[in-house]
Amino acid sequence: MKEILITNDDGFEALGIRALRNALKDIAKVTVVAPSSEKSACAHSITLTRPLRFIQLDDGFFKLDDATPSDCIYLALETMYKHKKPDLIISGINHGANLGEDITYSGTCGGAMEGTLQGVASMAISLLYKNDSIDKYGFDLACEISADIVKNIFENGFPLNGREFLNLNIPAVPKNEYKGLKIVPAGHQAYNTNAELHRNPRGLEYYWLGTPNIHYLKENDNECDLAVTFDGYASLTPIKLDMTAHHSINRLKSWI
């Protein structure tokens, strides 16, 4: 039987990871190793300044105390899968989309990156939400789409080369409004950052980083992950770990 290792950045109690585990249990042997608390926007960070401890919650279900998604994958592969790697690593289902440059912040994508670095086929899965869409529609559509892709991977092989992972984003729509799956590149966003200044009772200043106001120019980017996901499609994007701007190499040589 195929084996799948799952993590996330919303923590072990999140509805998304539990729904995904349940959706895949008849397809493969599923093991969950998730952070003990929410680690959104931790990117591909790993923990080097303190020890990490597995806590078993159920058969095949573990939380890693105060860990990041990348920690979870790193340590699971080093211990549970020391002698035989899983057939697939999935990070998700995230409560919120990871589109465009969100990928660079995303702990969900960070988990998939770690799996890719370790030579395992990996996928990040995220569900867009608008207002109360997750409360209204739940994770049924996301689980159905995810399960179909997993079956395809197991039947036909992982479609990407080494050092590449799949980034899947599901729209915030009910099943009857879902338009289908599109293979598209990552889009480009404009981030208007925000930080709120506060003072504690002793007058010391501190800041909360606010949620950035994000937008993109749809007329210039009609077939990107941002455009299609907000339009009711699921987007599937191949992401590579090589961040080199190859087209700028010669320009940089001439500049030096």
Swiss-Prot record:
Catalytic activity of the protein: a ribonucleoside 5'-phosphate + H2O = a ribonucleoside + phosphate
Enzyme class: hydrolase
Cellular localization per UniProt: Cytoplasm
Main location: cytoplasm
UniProt GO MF annotations: 3'-nucleotidase activity; 5'-nucleotidase activity; exopolyphosphatase activity; metal ion binding; nucleotide binding
Keywords carried by this UniProt record: Cytoplasm, Hydrolase, Metal-binding, Nucleotide-binding
One GO CC annotation: cytoplasm
Cofactor binding, per record: Binds 1 divalent metal cation per subunit.
EC number in record: 3.1.3.5
Cofactors required: a divalent metal cation
Domain of life: Bacteria
Xref: InterPro entries: SurE, SurE-like_Pase/nucleotidase, SurE-like_sf
Binding residues annotated for a divalent metal cation, in chain numbering: 9-10, 40, 94
Function: Nucleotidase that shows phosphatase activity on nucleoside 5'-monophosphates.
Family of this protein: Belongs to the SurE nucleotidase family.
Protein name: 5'-nucleotidase SurE
Organism: Campylobacter fetus subsp. fetus (strain 82-40)
